[in-house]
């Protein structure tokens, strides 16, 4: 009974220490939960978004354009999903826009705010630029001398990290954005570039596919999704959050444990006579060790309970 009464008295005598240790525990657990939830959330959202919107396995360009009537043959021969993607870069005063013609099979865009396009004078634009430059739904943007009404914002899987060029170091959402318009409006721009998107199946011969494409159409550039920063940055950010979560989970409690060890060690030295008296009263070494261990566990238990509540 004597030892049990000492718990409350010890806490009162060393209140500032117990409060500080409990606060450190609370901070460590909260930071862990926040970063862990953020990391797993980003990872889960990205993976599902990639699936829903048919993320590419690779993008490539060629010196010789692949005829449209060859696409079906390529898909059958190599057991791949293959699509020619049309786009055009347009420089306007204060911004640069990359307008895409809508894909049907690979790297589909998803309107996340507002509505999709339905008329030739409407566009949807990438969400990052809209938020950065305060472009509201209903505003009008000029593209190649014609005004288009913004009807919504979108994301697409191969541009979740908005790099204008794949070898850029930093994203650009202040002067560069993506846009979609109707096919007829896109055709009216009268200027277009193309690149090719491919999704391999489990039994696709990737090496043979690339070899044949190069022999027939002379590949200019080839970028696999695992080397595409616009895509991999999502996983990289998720991993960064998860690493930080476990760094907080281990480092802050270690600091707390070190502080507790110092304080409890000093307390044991100060109470040597009392420990001797308690031993004489019949308390075993094991009971005394448990007593001081409980004193050390109080801050951690208190912090854990506070976070749980």
Where are these predicted regions, by residue range?
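Mid-sequence acidic-hydrophobic segments that form the walls
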Residues: 132, 291, 304
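Membrane transport/envelope proteins' first extracytoplasmic loop
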Residues: 1-257, 266
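Hydrophobic alpha-helical transmembrane segments that constitute the membrane-spanning cores
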Residues: 251, 295-309
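Juxtamembrane/interface motifs at transmembrane-helix termini
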Residues: 40-41, 276-277, 308-309
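Interfacial "coupling" helices/loops that link adjacent transmembrane helices in transporter permeases
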Residues: 9, 14, 258-298
């Amino acid at each position: 009974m004597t030892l049990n009464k000492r718990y409350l008295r010890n806490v009162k005598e060393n209140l500032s220490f117990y409060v500080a240790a409990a606060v450190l525990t609370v901070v460590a657990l909260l930071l862990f939960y926040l970063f862990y939830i953020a990391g797993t959330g980003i990872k889960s959202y990205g993976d599902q978004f990639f699936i829903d919107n048919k993320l590419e396995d690779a993008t490539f360009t060629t010196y010789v354009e692949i005829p449209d009537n060859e696409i079906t043959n390529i898909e059958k021969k190599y057991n791949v999903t293959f699509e020619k993607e049309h786009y055009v870069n347009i420089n306007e005063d204060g911004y640069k826009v990359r307008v895409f013609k809508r894909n049907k099979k690979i790297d589909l865009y998803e309107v996340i705010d507002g509505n999709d396009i339905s008329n030739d004078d409407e566009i949807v634009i990438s969400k990052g630029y809209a938020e950065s430059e305060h472009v509201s739904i209903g505003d009008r943007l000029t593209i190649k001398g014609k005004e288009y009404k913004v009807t919504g914002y979108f994301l697409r899987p191969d541009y979740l990290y908005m790099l204008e060029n794949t070898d850029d170091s930093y994203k650009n959402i202040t002067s560069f954005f993506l846009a979609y318009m109707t096919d007829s409006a896109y055709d009216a721009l009268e200027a277009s570039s193309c690149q090719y998107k491919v999704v391999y199946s489990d039994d696709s011969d990737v090496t043979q596919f690339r070899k044949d494409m190069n022999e027939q159409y002379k590949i200019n550039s080839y970028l696999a999704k695992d080397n595409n920063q616009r895509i991999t940055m999502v996983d990289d950010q998720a991993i960064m959050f998860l690493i930080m979560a476990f760094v907080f989970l281990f480092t802050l409690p270690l600091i707390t444990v070190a502080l507790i060890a110092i304080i409890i060690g000093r307390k044991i030295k100060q109470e040597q006579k009392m420990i001797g008296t308690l031993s004489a009263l019949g308390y075993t070494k094991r009971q005394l060790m448990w007593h001081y261990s409980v004193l050390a566990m109080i801050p951690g238990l208190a912090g854990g309970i506070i976070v749980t509540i």
